[in-house]
């Protein structure tokens, strides 16, 4: 590996990079709290399963044609750093990423860093 982007980001921001997120409108959440919380629980379980059962996950990825080969998928899973941040850990990681973007160009995050209402913390509910 010529350059480990995860390590480089950790050196820059102090946390691992955020490469994806789940976004829910506040009005949708207010009307569907149970469903959203269940989705987050199942999503977290899927991440745990993927990391603990990489060969089986790779077979499923090939079966459902997400990746053409289970062998390729299994090699990729190990390098993907698949995680599910929730609550305070999610906010810490997201804020670090957004701060780097903001410092480079405030317009990249809408001109200001998000406030408390941007983040969902199930631990505080």
Where do the language-model regions lie?
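An extracytoplasmic/periplasmic, membrane-proximal ligand-sensing/linker region
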Residues: 56-125
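Pocket-lining segment of extracytoplasmic ligand-binding domains
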Residues: 1-61
């Amino acid at each position: 590996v010529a350059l480990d982007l995860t390590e480089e980001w950790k050196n820059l921001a102090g946390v691992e990079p955020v490469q994806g997120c789940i976004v829910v409108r506040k009005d949708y959440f207010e009307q569907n709290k149970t469903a959203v919380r269940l989705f987050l629980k199942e999503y977290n379980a899927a991440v745990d399963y993927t990391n603990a059962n990489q060969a089986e996950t790779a077979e499923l990825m090939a079966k459902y044609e997400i990746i053409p080969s289970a062998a390729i998928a299994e090699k990729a899973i190990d390098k993907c750093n698949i995680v599910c941040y929730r609550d305070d850990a999610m906010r810490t990681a997201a804020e670090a990423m957004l701060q780097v973007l903001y410092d480079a160009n405030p317009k990249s995050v809408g001109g200001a860093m998000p406030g408390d209402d941007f983040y969902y913390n199930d631990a505080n509910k």
